[in-house]
Curated annotation (Swiss-Prot):
It is a multi-pass membrane protein. GO terms for biological process: endoplasmic reticulum to Golgi vesicle-mediated transport; intracellular protein transport. It comes from Schizosaccharomyces pombe (strain 972 / ATCC 24843). Belongs to the YOS1 family. InterPro entries: Yos1. Component of the yip1-yif1 complex, composed of at least yif1, yip1 and yos1. Required for protein transport between endoplasmic reticulum and Golgi apparatus. This is Protein transport protein yos1. The keyword Disulfide bond does not apply. GO terms for cellular component: COPII-coated ER to Golgi transport vesicle; endoplasmic reticulum; endoplasmic reticulum membrane; Golgi membrane.
Length: 81
């Protein structure tokens, strides 16, 4: 019923959602913008700071792989339905 392919689709959709988050429009409203981040030397391993680092890492590292993976998934769905 809920197969491996569906899990991959959900993962891809969640990565896309994180990749397109706007820091000014969404994250800034809840106080999670770049300006609200910690300065140099202030290292706190709070859950909020870890989530912010994860969001920034996904947006930085996964941009081009997500473009390629999305293209492959679109072509796959067009060809095989």
């Amino acid at each position: 019923m809920f197969g491996f392919g569906n899990i991959l689709y959900v993962t891809l959709l969640l990565l896309n959602a994180v990749a397109i988050l706007s820091e000014d429009r969404f994250l800034g409203r809840i106080g999670w913008s770049q300006s609200a981040a910690l300065g140099f030397g202030d290292r706190q391993d709070t859950i909020k700071s870890r989530i912010l680092h994860l969001i920034r890492a996904i947006r930085t590292v996964m941009t081009f792989p997500l473009i390629a993976i999305n293209t492959i998934v679109i072509v796959y769905n067009l060809v095989l339905g």
